[in-house]
């Protein structure tokens, strides 16, 4: 995203006040939205489209670490992950990187889906929901 800022929206309801924070807001999406103590990350992709799936996975996981840190959270608080792979032959290589990154005993709910991604060079995309 080219725009790096945080926007907040405070909505007063009948019984409570709700805070909605958007991070890195662009024309089409925000990289992260925080609401009611839950962090929602947009699908994260690698910067280097020429890299192999393991390198791209490390880049994506570093982005996730950075974004969660901005919201005051970390990977131990991840609730759910959806991993998108255009080629399921990359499943084992991706899992090796994932297993080295995720804290032992802190694995979240997870699904891995084969899907065509937005650009042909993307070998992995990861979407995360985490506790703040």
Where are each of the predicted segments found?
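N-terminal presequence-like segments and the immediate start of the first folded domain
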Residues: 2-79, 85-132
